[in-house]
A protein has these predicted regions:
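Catalytic cores of the polymerase beta-like nucleotidyltransferase superfamily
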Residues: 22-237
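Cationic, low-complexity basic patches in intrinsically disordered or flexible, solvent-exposed regions
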Residues: 10, 20
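Compositionally biased non-globular segments, especially hydrophobic aliphatic-rich helices
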Residues: 2-5, 225
Length: 237
């Protein structure tokens, strides 16, 4: 029963209660649509306007099931409408398969950290880190022993923060199992899983948390907090 939301006057329907809510809802829907179009188009541009398209071709055509996606900083920066200065990729191929795929397309590469599944491809002096999907087998607070995986969500689950677990194919279709885009747009930094457990797995994660928290667009929050604390202390002198 929603008749209480409307008043009929001279054949005109006017929303009395609920108009601000509906307007806000529609604004959010259209904003998300426009924003998603912007993200999709810029990820497509990133593929078409950089040598990354050669890596996508090499890895996506390696086998019937092979796939490579953008991950990490390049997606964060596109969502935040910042300049992309590096490109990281994730793939369901093993490191040896990545090397084989790159060789077949005459793409130069070197093994950056093959024990953790990372190969660096070099095209026109640009470097692209390609990391195989994996899951942690054991951790000691700094180093992790990993096992390669075919599961994208399993790979996402081992990452530190939701904003680092956003993937995209070359067409700009996002895979975001932990709502990292939403957190990024709202300025939230959330650990994946229990924060205490994630920090125990790798103690450097707390430093990365601080680094993300102190990004330029958040500095005013820190300054306001410090000023507020100073003001409170001054009042009690």
């Amino acid at each position: 029963m929603v008749s209480h939301l409307f008043l009929v006057q001279r054949s005109e329907v006017r929303i009395l209660v609920g108009q601000p809510y509906m307007n806000n809802l529609l604004d959010r829907i259209f904003f998300r649509s426009r924003n998603l179009d912007y993200i999709n188009q810029n990820l497509i541009n990133l593929t078409n306007q950089t040598p990354a398209n050669k890596i996508f071709e090499a890895l996506n055509t390696y086998s019937d099931n092979s796939e490579v996606r953008y991950v990490g900083g390049c997606i964060r920066k596109i969502i935040k409408k910042e300049t992309v200065d590096d490109i990281d990729l994730a793939t369901n191929l093993t490191p040896s398969e990545v090397c084989d795929a790159l060789k077949k397309k005459d793409i130069k590469f070197y093994e950056t950290g093959v024990e953790h599944g990372t190969i660096t491809a070099i095209i026109d002096e640009y470097k692209y880190e390609i990391t195989s999907l994996s899951k942690d087998v054991t951790t000691d607070g700094r180093h992790a022993k990993v096992e390669f995986s075919l599961d994208w969500k399993e790979d996402a689950a081992r990452r530190d923060f939701s904003i680092n677990s956003i993937y995209s194919d070359k067409e700009g279709n996002l895979f975001d199992p932990f709502n990292g885009k939403k957190d990024l747009e709202s300025g939230s930094i959330n650990f994946i899983g229990e924060a205490e457990n994630r920090i125990k797995e790798d103690y450097l994660r707390i430093l990365r948390y601080v680094r993300f928290f102190l990004m330029p667009h958040r500095l005013h929050l820190v300054l306001n907090l410090l000023l507020d604390q100073y003001h409170q202390r001054f009042l009690f002198l």
